Amino acid sequence: MNTSILAPPESLLEAQKVRLAIREGYDRPTAGMANGLTQVNMISVPQDWAYDFLLYTQRNPQSCPVLDVIDAGQFQSRLIQDKQHDIRTDFPRYRIWEYGQCVDEVNDATSIWNNHPDLVTFLIGCSFSFESALLNAGIEVRHITDQRNVPMYLSNIPCASAGRISGNMVVSMRPIPAAQVSQAVQITAKMPRVHGAPVHIGDPKSLGIADLSKPDFGDFPRILDGEIPVFWACGVTPQAAVMRSKVPFAISHAPGYMLITDVPDQAWML
């Protein structure tokens, strides 16, 4: 890989330690871990569905920004230098999908993967990767403060279909003080490879979200007086497409349980 985009040695060591802890059974959301390093979503689909999925990601770059594609039979990413890493073990939690239904959650997907050797894997940018920039600007990230998972919602925003794949956008939400919303927009707009600027600010009902306290994925948020809900496109969108399109088989990360890479967040800053 291009070592010029790697994080400094001390950060690489931290990433390696986190991946090892996950491999050995750590099972919690990864927001705030290995601060400053890129985290990624994952979706793995059978080879005969891979082109449709690739086209789907290209038509929906804000919600599905592809950072790497891993061929069938391969289990390592160009985003990680450490040769011990394995995408089958280095996410804290995986979801197993059959015909659009989540049938299981596991912490190690190796044996399941062995039964499906034709899976092609897409690593998708994650909004966790702009959170260090928000924190550095003095903007609180509430789910990190509260040590909870980020709230995510299935919106009414349709994605552009591709072949057999269709679905609506999933959005993540962060409550931001009104006086800091414009700054949060400016910061995240500079990072389009990890979802970029918000897709909506304010009234959740405009997105088809009836109750913010009941996210479709993640934990319910704590919103304080004077804060505005701000919504970003989310890399869980491919899972919504799996559900809608009834893909025969797929493996994904569990929402909020990401892979830590060796690439610094700043690598995606324009």
From Swiss-Prot:
Enzyme class: lyase
Pfam families in UniProt: D-Glu_cyclase (PF07286)
GO molecular function: lyase activity
Swiss-Prot/TrEMBL keywords: Lyase
E.C. number(s) listed in UniProt: 4.2.1.-
Keyword Lyase attached: yes
Entry-linked NCBIfam families: PRK05463.1
UniProt name for this protein: Putative hydro-lyase ACIAD2519
Alphabetized InterPro entries for the sequence: D-Glu_cyclase, Putative_hydro-lyase, UPF0317
Family assignment from sequence similarity: Belongs to the D-glutamate cyclase family.
